[in-house]
Swiss-Prot record:
GO biological process: ATP synthesis coupled electron transport
Record text on subunit structure and interactions: NDH-1 is composed of 14 different subunits. Subunits NuoA, H, J, K, L, M, N constitute the membrane sector of the complex.
MF annotations from Gene Ontology: NADH dehydrogenase (ubiquinone) activity; NADH:ubiquinone reductase (non-electrogenic) activity; quinone binding
GO cellular component: plasma membrane
Main location group: membrane
Domain of life, per lineage: Bacteria
Protein name (Swiss-Prot/TrEMBL): NADH-quinone oxidoreductase subunit N 1
Keywords: Cell membrane, Membrane, NAD, Quinone, Translocase, Transmembrane, Transmembrane helix, Transport, Ubiquinone
Organism phylogeny: Bacteria, Bacillati, Chloroflexota, Chloroflexia, Chloroflexales
Reactions performed catalytically: a quinone + NADH + 5 H(+)(in) = a quinol + NAD(+) + 4 H(+)(out)
Length: 540
């Protein structure tokens, strides 16, 4: 098992992200900028443009590499021969094959995750370009890129040490981004809280890895002590079967790993950091944190549990411990209830969406429960439901927090009261926010409806009927606080009728998110087949 030169194309998007981050940081540092406001605005604009163009290029390369999405035709003697040849070469040396060094998978699952993170980073960049970045914009965008790189590696990791390093790369970048606005009262506090809770979760996750490593080493010693890489997910899965799956050391390690990642995806009771951080961080960072970061945590948790602990899967029963699906069922139950009920009294829009995000984490756990089924078809459906929900949720939340970023920039407040009479001040923004909020609520025919429908079906097929029933009830409860947005924007009188414009780049990001939410709602099969193809690989 060694790294070959032919493996380089398989990690080309990650290499491009690394080079792009260094380029953005270097160009900002090496260019002499004036100290005036105009010079700083130009500095932020150039850094944002370079980041957006670079991320767009990386997205295109990742899209072309994903040969299961489409096949690049052979050159036919035309003006596009150079591009077609390049595309064919990218696909030939792209995804597929066994994991690199056994630790980095380049399967369809990785391809879709990679595109999701890069797309989210691109939209976040557009939102940030429409926001006021007052200092060191090169650092801001470089950290955003490095965080995206960490997330991409997280989703591809099939080895514990690589997963941990990727998690830290992503997290350390986000800690700094959360506290980016040092002149703000809330931003440094948000960064500090996120750092403290994130450091604790990383320590818990690492301790779980050490316990799991000890289990594998112990079992391997019993089997004769053959040389192995005990931190590979596949090696853990090979030993965690039969009676060994009930080993206290393995179960304890699994519990610590779930708890460590539980902080990253903000499930109850590991959610306490989320409302304060979401409210205090710069709005574009909150948008990225609530979407791409959560998606990366879920995808790592999914690959880890289904690859390293398939022998301890159990069944999603609330009344007894029966494997990791029992743990996830309990977490899903309390997360759905606490997240939605805690959102009811909130008056700050970002804090309200933070608790909403916690509730959505509970819905997402329902899709993972279907892994308890012995049927590959059921497992494929559950995996596809998880991926579909993450994509739709990311688009919807990015757009929603994008609207709040515009409001904060224009009005200086992100309270619900600041949204009163919004339709009289910015009709297009009001219409887009209405669509996005209705999608979060799961109203048909928007994409959020299908996302919830698929995860509820996954939970039902897994046999977690009581849990699905409670989730449906909490969905109805969530309508109350989602409709508060609509009441404020459309019904309550505006404190002052002063029209304002949405920055063009931020407007483009919000429009793109909204259009995709509507399109995926009207045509859910547009990406469902592709997602199912990727899910079938992950469900084997």
């Amino acid at each position: 098992m060694s790294f070959q030169i032919t493996d380089i194309p398989r990690i080309l998007p990650e290499l491009m992200l690394l080079l792009l981050g260094l380029l953005v940081l270097g160009s900002d540092v090496l260019t002499r900028w004036g100290r005036g406001p105009a010079a700083q605005l130009e500095r932020a604009r150039e850094a944002g443009q370079l980041t957006a163009v670079g991320l767009g290029l990386v997205f295109i390369v990742g899209l072309v590499q994903s040969r299961f999405l489409f096949t690049v035709p052979d050159p036919a003697g035309g003006p596009l021969d150079v591009l077609l040849t390049l595309g064919r070469n990218l696909q030939t040396g792209g995804p597929g094959g066994s994991p690199i060094l056994g630790a980095f998978a380049t399967d369809e699952f990785t391809m879709i995750a990679r595109l999701t993170f890069i797309g989210a980073a691109f939209l976040t960049t557009l939102l940030a370009m429409g926001y006021r970045l007052t200092a060191n914009p090169g650092e801001f965008y470089a950290l955003l890129i490095f965080s995206t790189l960490g997330m991409s590696i997280m989703a591809a990791a099939t080895e514990f040490i690589l997963a941990y390093l990727a998690l830290e790369l992503s997290s350390l970048s986000l800690y700094v981004l959360a506290g980016y606005f040092r002149e703000s009262e809330r931003s440094p506090e948000a960064g500090l809280k996120y750092f403290l809770f994130g450091s604790l979760s990383s320590a818990i996750f690492l301790y779980g890895i050490s316990l799991t490593y000890g289990f594998v080493a112990s079992e391997n010693q019993k089997a004769g002590g053959a040389p192995i890489i005990a931190t590979l997910f596949s090696e853990v899965g090979r030993f965690a079967t039969g009676d060994a799956a009930g080993s206290p050391l393995l179960i304890l390690g699994m519990l610590f790993i779930i708890a460590g990642l539980g902080y990253k995806i903000s499930v109850v009771p590991f959610h306490t950091w989320a409302p304060d951080v979401y409210q205090g961080a710069p709005p574009p960072v909150t948008a990225f944190l609530s979407t791409a970061s959560k998606a990366a945590g879920f995808l790592l948790l999914y690959r880890l549990l289904t690859t390293a602990f398939p022998g301890a899967v159990g069944a999603p029963r609330l009344e007894e411990f029966n494997g990791w699906t029992s743990i996830l069922a309990i977490l899903a139950l309390v997360t759905v209830i606490v997240g939605n009920l805690a959102a009811l009294p909130q008056t700050n829009a970002r804090r309200l969406l933070a608790y909403s995000s916690i509730g959505h984490a509970g819905f997402l756990l329902l899709a993972v429960l279907l892994w308890a089924s012995a049927s590959p078809v059921d497992r494929t459906f559950g995996t596809a439901a998880l991926i579909y929900y993450l994509i739709v949720y990311s688009l919807t939340n990015l757009g929603s927090f994008g609207v709040l970023a515009v409001l904060t920039n224009a009005l200086g407040s992100d309270d619900l009261s600041a949204m009163q009479g919004l339709w009289r001040r910015n009709m297009s923004l009001t219409l887009m926010m209405t669509i996005l909020i209705l999608s979060l609520a799961g109203i048909p025919p928007l994409a959020g409806f299908w996302a919830k429908f698929f995860v509820f079906m996954a939970g039902y097929q897994a046999g977690a009927v009581p849990l699905v029933t409670i989730a449906v009830i909490m969905t109805v409860v969530s309508l109350y606080y989602y409709l508060r947005f609509l009441k404020a924007m459309w019904i309550l009188p505006a404190p002052a009728i002063t029209p304002f414009k949405t920055p063009p780049v931020a407007n483009a990001a919000i429009i793109l998110s909204t259009v995709l939410v509507v399109l995926l709602g009207l045509l859910p099969n547009l990406i469902w087949g592709t997602i199912s193809s990727a899910a079938s690989v992950a469900a084997r």
